[in-house]
Amino acid sequence: MSLSVTRENFDEWMVPVYVPAPFIPVRGEGSRLWDQQGKEYIDFAGGIAVNALGHAHPALREALNEQANRFWHTGNGYTNEPALRLAKKLIDATFAERVFFCNSGAEANEAALKLARKYAHDRVGNHKSGIVAFKNAFHGRTLFTVSAGGQPTYSQDFAPLPPDIRHAAYNDLNSASALIDDNTCAVIVEPVQGEGGVIPATKAFLQGLRELCDRHQALLIFDEVQTGVGRTGELYAYMHYGVTPDILTTAKALGGGFPIGAMLTTQDYASVMTPGTHGTTYGGNPLATAVAGKVLDIINTPEMQNGVRQRHDAFIERLNTINARFGMFSEIRGLGLLLGCVLQTEFAGKAKLIAQEAAKAGVMVLIAGGDVVRFAPALNVSDEEIATGLDRFALACERLQTGGASCG
């Protein structure tokens, strides 16, 4: 018999680095979840842009079960068929010629930054070690990646931090240009800053970064952990901009809920990563890569990407209607199904309160800082789920505006 558990047990047993919602989800199907009490929620959080095909997608369950009945793990002393097939699919679908598999976005970004330093050291010299990143970015929680992320709140308690990392203002080419020089080995940027407020890069900004990197022989790294795998209406967001990175990192939606990450690059850059320079125990395991292969099969189609664009329009139309009623948002922005509603000054700092009220109303949403409500639903969310979920979100907005909201 299974141990009976409650939300209170989290506070008793877990390291307190999170403050989870007061309910515990126990079952999901598509874009719906149910908690221990049987209450239904429409899921517009998507596991923070992970559940690209919703919960318990039949094809993903089938792929996982089929591989689970074969074998689970061998370690990096052996390769496996699902990993090789997934690598080929990613290469065929992108600019990449080489793939490194890992387990998360942080690991993918760690690998990307290490590759950039190794390439610069081997080809130029150890003095070429500078990394330029951007304020309010998020690249992971390892010491290297949290230092590259431009949010001191996440890194200030862990000094001394890795050196030679500087931060420019996002979408400000002059700010970046002032920092990028011949000692820069890499520039790492999110095409859409997710945690930083759902802010899409301008085309001129990314094109300018490409030109600066070419001029100074620095590698351009696109962190597509949140924007990748169809989230923006293209398989990867770089395809919107006509700007090709040297390295791309991907995770989150790649496994549709099963943990996996990957770093994509070219043969030339990958060639410096010789045996022993980097590694992973679980990365590229057959369970993860079997599921991710099926995710790509489903998402990397014109029909799916057209559907994302159509659903984007449906969200924007309904969110604008909600805003016309309540006047809570100064801006609604984003690409595809990564959307952010920026709160008016009157409601500044209340994004978390809105998310809490939304959950009470039966819809799960995210925040991106204190002033932005974020949506990252499944790419196959239905019209009915969009309508029902946003009706519930409107109820949460109404409660907040009329003073009926309460913390908790």
Curated annotation (Swiss-Prot):
A Pfam family recorded for this sequence: Aminotran_3
Coiled-coil residue windows: none
Q: According to its UniProt record, which reaction does this protein catalyse?
A: N(2)-succinyl-L-ornithine + 2-oxoglutarate = N-succinyl-L-glutamate 5-semialdehyde + L-glutamate
In what pathway does it function?
Amino-acid degradation; L-arginine degradation via AST pathway; L-glutamate and succinate from L-arginine: step 3/5
Gene Ontology molecular-function annotations: identical protein binding; pyridoxal phosphate binding; succinylornithine transaminase activity
Which keywords are on file for this protein?
A: Aminotransferase, Arginine metabolism, Pyridoxal phosphate, Transferase
Which cofactors are reported in the record for this sequence?
pyridoxal 5'-phosphate
Which sequence positions carry the modification called N6-(pyridoxal phosphate)lysine?
252
| EC number assigned by the record | 2.6.1.81
Enumerate the Gene Ontology biological process terms.
Answer: alpha-amino acid biosynthetic process; arginine catabolic process to glutamate; arginine catabolic process to succinate; ornithine catabolic process
Q: Which Gene3D superfamilies match?
A: Aspartate Aminotransferase, domain 1, Type I PLP-dependent aspartate aminotransferase-like (Major domain)
Q: Which PANTHER family match?
A: AMINOTRANSFERASE CLASS III (PTHR11986), SUCCINYLORNITHINE TRANSAMINASE (PTHR11986:SF113)
Q: Which family does it belong to?
A: Belongs to the class-III pyridoxal-phosphate-dependent aminotransferase family. AstC subfamily.
Q: What does this protein do?
A: Catalyzes the transamination of N(2)-succinylornithine and alpha-ketoglutarate into N(2)-succinylglutamate semialdehyde and glutamate. Can also act as an acetylornithine aminotransferase.
What is the protein's given name? Succinylornithine transaminase
Gene that produces this protein: astC
